[in-house]
Amino acid sequence: MAVPARRTSKAKKNKRRTHYNLTAPTVKFDETTGDYSRSHRVSLKGYYKGRKIAKANAAK
């Protein structure tokens, strides 16, 4: 079983972890529905690229 020969220092550990982060989702304003939605996805009202392609789910 592989075991590290030496303990990893805090600096080395933190330098490795600099890229462990989350990115905010891209959000665009949809002129058809008038609300914001994520890019390249169908809006909650069933629109994609300004065209109605799906039925919207009715909220209960």
Swiss-Prot record:
It comes from Streptococcus mutans serotype c (strain ATCC 700610 / UA159). GO terms for molecular function: structural constituent of ribosome. One of its GO terms (biological process) is translation. The keyword Transmembrane does not apply. Belongs to the bacterial ribosomal protein bL32 family. The keyword Amino-acid biosynthesis does not apply. Keywords: Ribonucleoprotein, Ribosomal protein. Pfam families: Ribosomal_L32p. This is Large ribosomal subunit protein bL32. GO terms for cellular component: large ribosomal subunit.
